[in-house]
């Protein structure tokens, strides 16, 4: 499995993703990342996007993982 981008926060976090093609973009906390990697159903912020850039905002302390499925290469930044 490829390296999954993540960011740690003690409050609010935003991510901006630039896609080349339509893709599923998920921002998940540590618990839901573990569920995702073990094939269980998981809760996420995001969804299927056909337009770029994608912006997702979350609030909550901890580590957040960015998962991009399909769409080929992408660029991202947490802020």
Roles of regions detected by a PLM:
Residues 1-79:
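Acidic, Ser/Thr/Pro
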């Amino acid at each position: 499995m490829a390296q999954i981008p993540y960011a740690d926060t003690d409050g609010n976090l935003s991510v901006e993703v630039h896609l080349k093609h339509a893709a599923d973009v998920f921002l998940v906390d540590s618990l839901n990342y573990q569920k995702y990697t073990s094939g269980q159903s998981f809760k996420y912020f995001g969804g299927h996007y056909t337009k770029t850039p994608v912006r997702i905002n979350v609030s909550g302390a901890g580590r957040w993982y960015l998962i991009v499925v399909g769409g080929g290469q992408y660029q991202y930044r947490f802020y």
